[in-house]
A protein has these predicted regions:
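N-terminal beta-loop-helix "entrance" segment that forms/cooperates
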Residues: 31-54, 230
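Accessory "access/gating" subregions that flank catalytic or transport cores
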Residues: 194-205, 209-253, 257-262, 351, ...
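Buried hydrophobic packing segments
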Residues: 19, 23, 297-305, 347
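Glycine-rich phosphate/nucleotide-binding loop
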Residues: 43-45, 104, 229-329
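Buried hydrophobic positions in well-ordered alpha/beta secondary-structure cores of metabolic enzymes
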Residues: 9-12, 64, 129, 169, ...
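N-terminal glycine-rich phosphate/adenylate-binding segment common to multiple enzyme folds
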Residues: 46-152, 245
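Glycine-rich phosphate/diphosphate-binding loop of Rossmann-like nucleotide-binding domains
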Residues: 4-21, 25-27, 147-222
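Flexible, glycine/charged-enriched surface loops at secondary-structure junctions
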Residues: 31-35, 177-190, 213-221, 310-318, ...
């Protein structure tokens, strides 16, 4: 099976290279039947005119799965002042209707949390399901500035969009082991229904969909309150479902509790297509230094492997990574001194020893 690989910008090509080296080992020594097709696509190549959004979408169309490295460069902005990379990222999401952004918040073995009382024995493991096709971010291609005096962006919440994202959240909860503190399966609706009609509608549809999932508990929390709850009681959480921008913000906060964005991985899903990517950016300030943490990229690849039906290979991959971390082969952001290449080679060594 062919998958599309987008190499991105900044540290993107470096951490993608690490991931694909590991994929090669899985292909040669395990059961993985995936063939990566690499494309030098990112904000830089788009800015240089090598790739237009239309050409990128056309190239991506035949693939069921896309593995995407971080894209973007703060220096590359369009006339509106927004980064050019967003045209590619949001273009892919909207064009292929990748409506569900699934972002696990998971503390890996051997990684320290900034939260008191959280460790390997009292860990963190929940999932944020972010509506990915509407909400406030749907204004990216349609916001306006009037007479250089007023800027307007609109939030869009539809019944169809809300029903399908909430249904996915409940389905994930049903398949999960529940909250770490209690084992209870639950979905928490995060909104500002006390202020905005769009969020009140989101909650109304949430309740309607919840009726179809009687074995999963429903919970509610306002977006501002959830920022505190995620820090104080993360082990009580199972699945969170929320609007586009709230999901973006909350998942970054969640990442800070499990080691940082270097450990934040994600999937953008529709019924027929998936795009898998780290949550973090392209970190152009450390590009080329060989010190980037590739874990989020590798775990995103693991999500893709699992989604394509190779769940055993994902488990093998993750166990090899955990072994590498336990042996203190850590990049600087993890408190170690290893280079990206050394960490990658340690994972490969673990895979080969267990094959």
């Amino acid at each position: 099976m062919d998958v599309m690989v987008l190499e991105g910008d900044g540290i993107g090509p470096e951490i993608m290279s690490s991931s694909l080296k590991i994929m090669d080992v899985l292909r040669e020594n395990y059961d993985l039947k995936i063939n990566p097709i690499r494309y030098d696509i990112g904000a830089k190549t788009a800015d240089e005119g090598k790739w237009t959004l239309e050409k990128i979408l056309e190239a991506a169309d035949p693939y069921k799965a896309i593995l995407k490295a971080p894209m973007g460069d703060p220096k590359l902005v369009g006339e509106s002042g927004t980064e050019k990379a967003l045209d590619i990222i949001l273009g892919l999401r909207f064009h292929f209707d990748l409506y569900a952004n699934v972002r696990p918040v998971r503390l890996l073995p051997g990684i320290a949390s900034v939260l008191r009382g959280i460790d390997d024995k009292n860990s963190i493991d929940y999932t944020i399901v972010r509506e990915n096709s509407e909400g406030l971010y749907s204004s990216h291609f349609g916001g306006m500035v009037l007479r250089d005096s007023v800027a307007i962006d609109n939030q869009i919440v539809t019944r169809e969009g809300t029903e399908r994202i909430v249904d996915m959240a409940f389905n994930l909860a049903e398949k999960s082991k529940g909250a770490l503190s209690s084992g209870k399966r639950s979905v928490t609706c995060v909104d500002k229904s006390n202020v905005l009609k769009s969020f009140a509608f989101f909650r109304k549809v949430f309740d309607e969909v919840a009726e179809k999932h009687p074995h999963v508990e429903r919970q509610y929390m306002y977006g501002d309150a959830m920022t505190q709850y995620m820090l104080l009681h993360p082990r009580n959480l199972n699945v969170i479902v929320t609007e586009n921008m709230f999901g973006d913000i909350l998942s970054d906060l969640g990442a800070s509790t499990v080691g940082g964005l270097g450990f934040a991985y994600s999937a953008n899903l529709s019924m027929k297509k998936g795009m898998f990517e780290p949550v973090h950016g392209s970190a152009v300030d450390i590009a080329g230094k060989g010190i980037a943490n590739p874990i989020a990229m590798i775990l995103s690849m693991g999500m893709m492997i699992d989604w394509l039906g190779f769940s055993k290979d994902r488990l093998v991959l993750e166990e090899a990574m955990f072994s590498a971390i336990r042996k203190d082969t850590k990049t600087p952001d993890m408190g170690g001194g290893a280079k990206t290449a050394a960490f990658t080679e340690q994972i490969i060594s673990e895979l080969l020893n267990n094959s």
